[in-house]
């Protein structure tokens, strides 16, 4: 059953100095670990790059972890992703730079978003990362999102 979330309250209180679509502050070590997992999944599993492919993977129930860059301009390009991830119960994390996200995804240009579909050799690390993300979410008054089960 899909959860309905009011976008006005969903985007009401971003952390200071962050774009409106950022729901919680992600520590640098967590963001770096997410980029590392994306890189490992690219080599040993399956990922998708870009906002459109990320959106499709979440909607189709394929996503295990969504990475969203914090420096996207215009921010409306990725603003729907946190809300979609909440509705579909997919873990998501913010990374500081779209350049770093593109590099971790294995492309020579920046990427606004990317998604891990199959973690490959990073499966154990992915579960540990989602636990850390849920700890950060709890500090901001958000509910935990479990790692999606295998299909």
Swiss-Prot record:
Q: Where in the cell is it found?
A: Cytoplasm
Q: What does this protein do?
A: Multifunctional RNA-binding protein that recognizes the K-turn motif in ribosomal RNA, the RNA component of RNase P, box H/ACA, box C/D and box C'/D' sRNAs.
| Organism (species) | Pyrobaculum aerophilum (strain ATCC 51768 / DSM 7523 / JCM 9630 / CIP 104966 / NBRC 100827 / IM2)
Query: Chief localization class?
Result: cytoplasm
Highest rank taxon of the organism:
Archaea
PROSITE patterns linked to this entry: RIBOSOMAL_L7AE
Oligomer status and interactors: Part of the 50S ribosomal subunit. Probably part of the RNase P complex.
Q: Which Pfam families match?
A: Ribosomal_L7Ae
Give the signal peptide range. none
Q: Mind telling me what this protein is named?
A: Large ribosomal subunit protein eL8
Family note: Belongs to the eukaryotic ribosomal protein eL8 family.
Give the UniProt entry's GO cellular component terms.
cytoplasm; ribonucleoprotein complex; ribosome
Q: Which UniProt keywords apply?
A: Cytoplasm, Ribonucleoprotein, Ribosomal protein, RNA-binding, rRNA-binding, tRNA processing
Q: Tell me which Gene Ontology terms the entry assigns under biological process.
A: ribosome biogenesis; translation; tRNA 5'-leader removal
Molecular function as annotated in GO: ribonuclease P activity; rRNA binding; structural constituent of ribosome
